[in-house]
Amino acid sequence: MKSIRRGDGLNVVPFIDIMLVLLAIVLSISTFIAQGKIKVSLPNAKNAEKSQPNDQKVVVISVDEHDNIFVDDKPTNLEALSAVVKQTDPKTLIDLKSDKSSRFETFISIMDILKEHNHENFSISTQAQ
């Protein structure tokens, strides 16, 4: 009669080691992804205030140097932006990031849309000098 050896089985320790390394990589990379992807060179301001982080939902409207408009890093146009602002709760903060090389007309168009929909809770991002 054959004897059954105990101890034969799958060694999971190397698998756990690999999973921990992958977890560390994912966590370190995810901090870089959280940053905005649209490159916007903000205008300088001497009296710029540092924004206070809070748990409030923020909708970010970005305008790049070629006057392309983005809502939360997704490309859009003025008509679609108007629909987004209309659907957004008036208490939700809208952060406007306009590139210093973009046309002022685009900035004013966005401000008109905010005013049209009575959305007064917004901030304009600048870079401290």
Swiss-Prot record:
What InterPro entries does the annotation carry?
Answer: ExbD (IPR003400), TonB_ExbD_2 (IPR014171)
Note the topology in the membrane. Single-pass type II membrane protein
GO MF terms listed in the record are:
transmembrane transporter activity
- Show which residues sit on the Periplasmic side of the membrane: 34-129
Biological process terms from the Gene Ontology for this record are: protein transport
Q: Where is the signal peptide?
A: none
- A GO CC term? plasma membrane
Q: Which UniProt keywords apply?
A: Cell inner membrane, Cell membrane, Membrane, Protein transport, Transmembrane, Transmembrane helix, Transport
rRNA-binding recorded as keyword: no
Superkingdom, natural source: Bacteria
Q: Which residues lie on this side of the membrane: Cytoplasmic?
A: 1-12
List where the protein spans the membrane.
Answer: 13-33
- Similarity remark: Belongs to the ExbD/TolR family.
Q: How does it assemble?
A: The accessory proteins ExbB and ExbD seem to form a complex with TonB.
PANTHER family the record matches:
BIOPOLYMER TRANSPORT PROTEIN EXBD, EXBD MEMBRANE COMPONENT OF PMF-DRIVEN MACROMOLECULE IMPORT SYSTEM
User: What is the protein's name according to its record?
Assistant: Biopolymer transport protein ExbD
Task: Quote the gene name from the UniProt entry.
Answer: exbD
